[in-house]
Every structure is written in structure tokens, then in C-alpha cells.
């Protein structure tokens, strides 16, 4: 059996930054450090940070007064930001800058009284945060749609003053269809020059297309609550290949590879490389050859840490 590695795969700049913020806060201020929601959607990463002293909570009312709290990479609503400020909590915001860009767009539309439509998955923390950035006090409204059927059923108050934004981790193909449906139904709708799907999501989906075209089975390393990891698995399946989402090597099942010549391996944007290496090792234990890595788009994007953490680290 051959192992073929997708490129790029794994951590993106926003995930790197979010994990670094938690680690540096733990180094600079000592545990406990509170984190609202999983800082990134990966069990291995969250368990590691928990062992180091991070305490993950669902809401701010679980955070004691005079504590440090970190907002996850997925972003939060204005109400959460205001609650933290009102309580005087020390906040480090690990929201991915590409999610913040969408928040800025939504805030601008609300200020102008333009109604907004968010394309995204209901219940996802990023969607909850983005929806909560829209201030309805100017008379506008924000709507959520997930697919073309939602667009068909949608009624808005002001179709002449309407804009759309997207969750950053969606399927590129599915999102294009939803945007087409929106433009057909609401010809005057505004939108970003390019959809809000992030560079890492785009690159990893392109890499999986290449991978699936060459392999019999595709393994996606990622947690089941990771949106971008699920989209990678779905994309490989749409290309007619068996595809499996696994958190780690222990979830592999040897019968998946009966009669298989080429196994493709990739990882979602929140999955660390160590998990990929463990999956490769397990496959080699079962007789696979050393992996070959495909050529792919080079990523050199980095996002800076909050100034106080940079200063603290420099002083240390």
C-alpha cells in the first residue's frame, strides 16, 4: 500500500495563533486560565491545554471575577464582549483575524441599516459569534441560511438594502451555489468581492481534490466537531472515494484498506502534525510504504499575538 500526503494540511495561521495565545497566557500569568469554548475544535489540542492548566467553559458566568479569559478562534458576539468588559475580566481575544474581518463587515452593515445574510451552519460557534455582531438597534436584521432551500424559503424586510457574508470554513462548492441562489433571488444584494471562506479552507479543499483523484481511500485527521475537517471528508466522498474522519490512529480500522493500493492522508486546519504522523505509523505497521507528499500551495501567512503577550514573553 502507498501512502500519499496532501499538501497543505493541518494547522492554519489562525489555529497556530489561538493555541499560542493560550500557551503564552499560561506561561505569563500561570494557571488557571479560562477559555470560552474549545479554543480550536481538536480533542488532542484541548486535552493538552487542559492538562497545562486551561479551564474550558461554555459561558462567562462560569468564570470567576478577576480572572483571565480567552475567547476561542471562532469569535464571540458583542454581548459576550460587553459582559466581559462589564465584569472587568482580563480578556485575550484568540478570534482568528479572518473571522474578525467578517465581524467588521457585519458591524458595518448593521451601522448602515443594511440587512445581512450569513451563510453558515446553525449552532457552530463562529456562526453564533458573527450573528451576535450585528446590532439590530438601527432597524436592520441578520438572517442565517445554510443551503439553497433556505434561500428559497427566506423572506427579508428590505431586499433593496441587503448584503451577505459567509462562515470561513464552508465547502467552497456548496457556498458558490448558495451565493448564486442569493443573487438570483435578490438581484441587488451586496457581498464581498471574494467570499469570506479563508485561504486555509480553500487550500485544503483544493489539496483534497488532488489527493482523492490519485487515491482509493482518503483519511482526514480531525475531530468530529471540526467544520473544515468534515468538509474535507465530504469532498472526497463526492469524488467517489471512501473517506473517513478520524481523531487519531486508534480510530483506524484495518478492514478499510482491504484491497486498497493508495491511501490518501490529510488533516483539518485544527489537527496537529503529531496526529498525522501517528496515523502514518499505524498504516506502516499494517504494511504500508513510506509516505509520499504531493506538491501544493505554499502557506507563509502568520498572525501576531496580542501585544501584552508579546511583551510578557520578551521580558521573560
Swiss-Prot record:
GO terms for molecular function: 4 iron, 4 sulfur cluster binding; 4-hydroxy-3-methylbut-2-enyl diphosphate reductase activity; metal ion binding. InterPro entries: LytB/IspH. Dimethylallyl diphosphate binds at residues 41, 74, 124, 226-228, 270. Binds 1 [4Fe-4S] cluster per subunit. [4Fe-4S] cluster binds at residues 12, 96, 198. Its cofactor is [4Fe-4S] cluster. Pathway: Isoprenoid biosynthesis; dimethylallyl diphosphate biosynthesis; dimethylallyl diphosphate from (2E)-4-hydroxy-3-methylbutenyl diphosphate: step 1/1; Isoprenoid biosynthesis; isopentenyl diphosphate biosynthesis via DXP pathway; isopentenyl diphosphate from 1-deoxy-D-xylulose 5-phosphate: step 6/6. It holds the Pfam family LYTB. It catalyses: isopentenyl diphosphate + 2 oxidized [2Fe-2S]-[ferredoxin] + H2O = (2E)-4-hydroxy-3-methylbut-2-enyl diphosphate + 2 reduced [2Fe-2S]-[ferredoxin] + 2 H(+); dimethylallyl diphosphate + 2 oxidized [2Fe-2S]-[ferredoxin] + H2O = (2E)-4-hydroxy-3-methylbut-2-enyl diphosphate + 2 reduced [2Fe-2S]-[ferredoxin] + 2 H(+). Its EC number is 1.17.7.4. Catalyzes the conversion of 1-hydroxy-2-methyl-2-(E)-butenyl 4-diphosphate (HMBPP) into a mixture of isopentenyl diphosphate (IPP) and dimethylallyl diphosphate (DMAPP). Acts in the terminal step of the DOXP/MEP pathway for isoprenoid precursor biosynthesis. This is 4-hydroxy-3-methylbut-2-enyl diphosphate reductase. The gene is ispH.
Amino acid at each position: 500500500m502507498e501512502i500519499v500526503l496532501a499538501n497543505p494540511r493541518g494547522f492554519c495561521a489562525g489555529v497556530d495563533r489561538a493555541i499560542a495565545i493560550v500557551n503564552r497566557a499560561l506561561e505569563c500569568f500561570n494557571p488557571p486560565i479560562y477559555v470560552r469554548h474549545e479554543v480550536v475544535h481538536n480533542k488532542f489540542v484541548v486535552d493538552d491545554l487542559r492538562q497545562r492548566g486551561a479551564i474550558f467553559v461554555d459561558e462567562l458566568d462560569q468564570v470567576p471575577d478577576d480572572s483571565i479569559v480567552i475567547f476561542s478562534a471562532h469569535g464571540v458576539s458583542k454581548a459576550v464582549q460587553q459582559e466581559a468588559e462589564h465584569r472587568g475580566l482580563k480578556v485575550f481575544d484568540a478570534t482568528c483575524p479572518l473571522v474578525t474581518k467578517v465581524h467588521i463587515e457585519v458591524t458595518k452593515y448593521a451601522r448602515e441599516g443594511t440587512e445581512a445574510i450569513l451563510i453558515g451552519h446553525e449552532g457552530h460557534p463562529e456562526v453564533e459569534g458573527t450573528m451576535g455582531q450585528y446590532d439590530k438597534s438601527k432597524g436592520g436584521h441578520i438572517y442565517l441560511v445554510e443551503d439553497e432551500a433556505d434561500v428559497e424559503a427566506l423572506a427579508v424586510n428590505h431586499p433593496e438594502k441587503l448584503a451577505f457574508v459567509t462562515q470561513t470554513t464552508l465547502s467552497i462548492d456548496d457556498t458558490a451555489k448558495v451565493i448564486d441562489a442569493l443573487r438570483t433571488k435578490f438581484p441587488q444584494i451586496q457581498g464581498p468581492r471574494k467570499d469570506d471562506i479563508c485561504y486555509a479552507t480553500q487550500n485544503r479543499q483544493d489539496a483534497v481534490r488532488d489527493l482523492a483523484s490519485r487515491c482509493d481511500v482518503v483519511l482526514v485527521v480531525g475531530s468530529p466537531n471540526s467544520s473544515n475537517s468534515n468538509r474535507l471528508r465530504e469532498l472526497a466522498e463526492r469524488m467517489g472515494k471512501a473517506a473517513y474522519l478520524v481523531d487519531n490512529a486508534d480510530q483506524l480500522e484495518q478492514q478499510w484498506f482491504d484491497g486498497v493500493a493508495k491511501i490518501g492522508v490529510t488533516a483539518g486546519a485544527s489537527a496537529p502534525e503529531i496526529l498525522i504522523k501517528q496515523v502514518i505509523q499505524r498504516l506502516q505497521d499494517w504494511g504500508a510504504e513510506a509516505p509520499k507528499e504531493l506538491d501544493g500551495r505554499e502557506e507563509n501567512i502568520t498572525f501576531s499575538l496580542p501585544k501584552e503577550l508579546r511583551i510578557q514573553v520578551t521580558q521573560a
